[in-house]
Amino acid sequence: MMSRLKTAVYDYLNDVDITECTEMDLLCQLSNCCDFINETYAKNYDTLYDIMERDILSYNIVNIKNTLTFALRDASPSVKLATLTLLASVIKKLNKIQHTDAAMFSEVIDGIVAEEQQVIGFIQKKCKYNTTYYNVRSGGCKISVYLTAAVVGFVAYGILKWYRGT
């Protein structure tokens, strides 16, 4: 599911030609992407409209952080990752369009990257735990199968020896 979410984000945002794109064009793309993800995967993407309409164009960094925190409160790790990717892409592209000082949003982008790494770490840790748990269980199953086969073989060998009288 995570890869499909990220694909949806990148499809909507990377198909836009920055040189020909106005702020409104980009925000329309973001709106379409939010609609698509909202219909398909998540409930809280409508809160990203608040970020778009009120905060990104006015560069209100505090509100962007607060709204993002609210939007991600109940989201699964994969939805968080897609949202963070989406917001980072939009902010970077708006910086390119407006030719603003990239340092203005560097703090937000750094925070997003750090949060992405935490989410990725959580997903990897969960997968590692599940894999280890599965391997332990399947390893335990293999041992019990081998023991059962050995006992059955030993009993069959004993019955065969008894039947032959040797």
Curated annotation (Swiss-Prot):
InterPro entries: Bcl-2-like_sf, Poxvirus_F1/C10. It comes from the Viruses. It is found in: Host mitochondrion; Host membrane. Signal peptide: none annotated. Its main location: host cell. The chain crosses the membrane at residues 138-160. One of its GO terms (cellular component) is host cell mitochondrion. It is a single-pass membrane protein. It holds the Pfam family M11L. Interacts with host BAX; this interaction inhibits apoptosis activation. Interacts with host BAK1. This is Apoptosis regulator M11L. It comes from Myxoma virus (strain Lausanne). The gene is m011L.
